[in-house]
Amino acid sequence: MQQAPVVLSTLDKLLNWGRSNSLWPLTYGLACCAIEMMATGGSRFDFDRFGTIFRASPRQSDVMIIAGTLTKKHAEFMRRLYDQMPEPKWVISMGSCANTGGMFNTYATVQGADRIIPVDIYLPGCAPRPETLQYALMVLQDKIRRSKAIKQDAPKRLV
């Protein structure tokens, strides 16, 4: 097993620290869970202390929080927003409806956001409390800190 150079591992930690403490979620509220998501931005829960600022543009976001029931009409639009987000990007699926379709088992409902885009963290509940979303953000921060910021599988130059 080949070890990464000391300089790269230190740079890795620095990049991951910066990324984990500056998460900008894309607000993608679809139903009741969106109200709980908005509550986390209020003064009582204060998402800003984690370095988290809600963004309305996917080009300024690195986290997508899917909050609510996802219909098949919305699925294509959500995929397009996800594709517009810069790398690295993460997804939090918030609530039973976003996770599994919830109680809406119909032809028009997507039975889980992970059928459309990859999901990193699932929040159970109907609707999950703001504290749960804060905890999910802290779990995501830990996941980012443990990941490799610098990819070793970069294409090799021939010349």
From Swiss-Prot:
Binds 1 [4Fe-4S] cluster. It comes from Helicobacter acinonychis (strain Sheeba). Signal peptide: none annotated. Keywords: 4Fe-4S, Cell inner membrane, Cell membrane, Iron, Iron-sulfur, Membrane, Metal-binding, NAD, Quinone, Translocase, Transport, Ubiquinone. GO terms for cellular component: plasma membrane; respiratory chain complex I. GO terms for biological process: aerobic respiration; electron transport coupled proton transport. NDH-1 is composed of 14 different subunits. Subunits NuoB, C, D, E, F, and G constitute the peripheral sector of the complex. NDH-1 shuttles electrons from NADH, via FMN and iron-sulfur (Fe-S) centers, to quinones in the respiratory chain. The immediate electron acceptor for the enzyme in this species is believed to be ubiquinone. Couples the redox reaction to proton translocation (for every two electrons transferred, four hydrogen ions are translocated across the cytoplasmic membrane), and thus conserves the redox energy in a proton gradient. It comes from the Bacteria. This is NADH-quinone oxidoreductase subunit B. It holds the Pfam family Oxidored_q6. GO terms for molecular function: 4 iron, 4 sulfur cluster binding; iron ion binding; NADH dehydrogenase (ubiquinone) activity; NADH:ubiquinone reductase (non-electrogenic) activity; quinone binding. It is found in: Cell inner membrane. The keyword Signal does not apply. It is a peripheral membrane protein. Belongs to the complex I 20 kDa subunit family.
